[in-house]
Amino acid sequence: MVRLRIVILVYFVASLVLGAQKLDNLKCMFLGYPELEYDGFDRTEVLTEKNFNKTVFSEDSKSVVFFNDVEEDDPELDQYECFMQLSAQIMTKRGYTFFTVNTTKEVKLRKQEGVDKGEDTIHVYKDGFKIEYNGVRDPETFVSWMMDIPDDPVTIINDEHDLEEFEDLEDDTVRVIGYFEPGSAALKEYEEAAEDFMGEIEFFAVVTSKWARKVGLKRIGEIQMLRPFEEDPIYAPSSADTEEEIEDWVEKHREPVMQKLTLENYFNVWKDPEDDERMILAFVDEETREGRAMKKLLDKIADENSEHAGTLEIVLIDPDEFPLMVDVWEEMFGIDIEEGPQIGLVDISEKEGIWFDISQINLDDPKKHSDSNFEVLQTWIDQIMSGSITLEDDDDDDEPEPTTPPTPVKGKKGKKEL
């Protein structure tokens, strides 16, 4: 087993004293960090439609806004407060201001900021940019993510350190990189397009031929997108040179075939797919021999199925990175994750799945059986994409066959069914 990442567990008691400068009745304990204590001070302010824009979009402001519909009598209130207040305790020292918006009361503001009804969302507003946090509600993960927020929407590659940063993200996130003349209008358009994707897609640029060659760009104005686990880049059309055109191109191609579930992207990935998408979960422990063989096979599957991007979504999950969730997932889908790799077509909200028979592939000698393993798994993928394998079949099997209602007796009025 790999060294498990320390997880902060938040325990809470008592109730919140609203409007107090110090929340004396809010007790938070963080296991794993004995010296870490919440000092009891309320560092959050309430925002409304009247003061929102002038507050979060003011010059040089760094605002963290918690959009929520948690009510005073909600049992989750104290847990939510502990997460929010400890994060504020740490990050206010670094220039951030923390706010809350009650989405039940501020409906117009909720819609303005693109927050769905009943959804708890966290937005960071920094230097005029809005960045949405999609990670788990854990102070350690959230604070770490905030500290890594870049100062600029585009990283200019000027040295080996920048190049290493670009290369290290290979299988972690979607990357976009372009070659521009320094200070050009085209670079400005590219930077403005990148603003709308901060926190979701990493944008890079090169402004010299030396670094352009190192990242595989040949001509000024060339833009590439590199998606996780796919070898070949996607090229933007040469006509895409304005902010709007670049945004449209990125939006069209941004969905990778396979992406890894992490603490930072959890709620952006662990959600029901769109109606025309198929979601496949792949539980793979990369510390085991079978897990490494399965991961290598899935890498090839993702690369060979790039034409299905946007309609096929493979979510790669390393159980070692989510030890507290293994039992939950096993019970949810009726599988044994610790037994070995598991891969299945799933419906998250319905908590059901159709699971591939792993015995059909040979993971003990993957080199010898590389071609046959790929063929078998690809055939299964093809059946899913063609509709031969579908979760809807299971739903249909459970439904009783419709019966023909009896013909009403002539001369009598049938009763209306309510």
Regions inferred by a protein language model and the residue ranges of each:
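Short pre-active-site segment immediately N-terminal to redox-active cysteine/selenocysteine motifs
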Residues: 60, 68-73, 284-287
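N-terminal leader/targeting and pre-domain segments
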Residues: 2-69, 86-174, 180-183, 197-209, ...
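Eukaryotic modular interaction domains in large regulatory/scaffold proteins
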Residues: 272-327, 333-339, 344, 350
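A short acidic, amphipathic alpha-helical/loop segment
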Residues: 109-112, 189-193, 214, 297, ...
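Residue-level detector of functional hotspots within protein domains
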Residues: 30, 38, 189, 300, ...
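Typically the conserved alpha-helix immediately C-terminal to a functionally engaged Cys/Sec
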Residues: 71-93, 99, 105-106, 183-199, ...
